[in-house]
Amino acid sequence: MQKIVKAKKPFIYPNNSNFKLAVWEEWAKVGGQSTGERPLEKFYESLSYHVDLPTLWQNKKEARLCFCEGASLRFDTFPDYLTHEVIPMFWDCWPKYWGVTEKWIKKHNVRTVFFTSSQTADHFRQLFPERNIFHIPEAIETELYKDEKKLRDRTIDYLEFGRCSRIVDSSKFDSSIRVLSSFNEKSGLATRTDLINALSNSKITIALTRLDNQPEIAEGIDTLTQRYWECMLSGVILLGRAPQELIDFIGYDPTVQINLQDVNSQIIHIKENIESYQELVDKNRQTALQLGDWKLRIKEIRKILLDLGYSL
């Protein structure tokens, strides 16, 4: 009998977003089955991070698709791994989590795994050639992002948000560069909607991967993040560097290579020649609309599962 795959709804953190929820919602929209709510999950959240119980048995009729992070693998899959075959889909499974993840896959007899990092998928494919290991590129909800203004009509020259501020200090920019920073409490970038609106009115932002801004965590892993899709969809110039897996996936480099020795002069030069970048950002938006949505990834995941003999 084919096992029916049911997805588990990710935990909803109080006063915080969970990006994995968007993937589960797309699964549900196309008719994918889901499990019920986890009873009392807020009470066992802390404990399940640190305790890895054995699999008691595996249900012969159902498998569970669980959306996981390397740091929260045990919680993201609890209590499902006790009684079901788990099919994990991983984000942020950095090398420091590989040892724990390898042991967990063996311990719970996991047969099928998805990773958003191609390098991480390659690593586990070499470890487990007999198991089903797949790379599913990062994606986003493309319909949320807008591109209503041409670059010349935007009022924010440089939008600063996220970890990239560790690389570039906007406080040292020329006063002619109009900066909006998420680190300024008065900027009004308190919500995701605020960020989406700011992106659509910005000309330039920095786009780098964790390999650039936190190499001690990345440890050589260079992977696509939602930041690239956000900026491409919003028609913003990505000043930085693209991971090779993004270049391979879309067929070109969507960024303007950053000169870390003189970012200030580079931004001024881009401002003075802003209309020459319109063609690139238009191409980036169309590419992101065509290739960057979670709907496409869920379609791919469903096909893989059916090809492997699971039932939906």
Identify the role of each PLM range:
Residues V23, D262, E272-N273:
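Acidic/polar helix N-cap motif
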Residues K271-L306, S311:
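A charged, aromatic-enriched C-terminal amphipathic alpha-helix characteristic of glycosyltransferases
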Residues M1-A63, F67-F78, F90-Y252, R297, ...:
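Nucleotide-sugar donor-binding catalytic core of glycosyltransferases
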Residues L238, P254-N259, I304-L312:
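Short, contiguous hydrophobic alpha-helices characteristic of membrane insertion segments
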Residues Q226, I258-Q261, G292:
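Residue-level signal for the nucleotide or nucleotide-sugar donor/cofactor binding architecture
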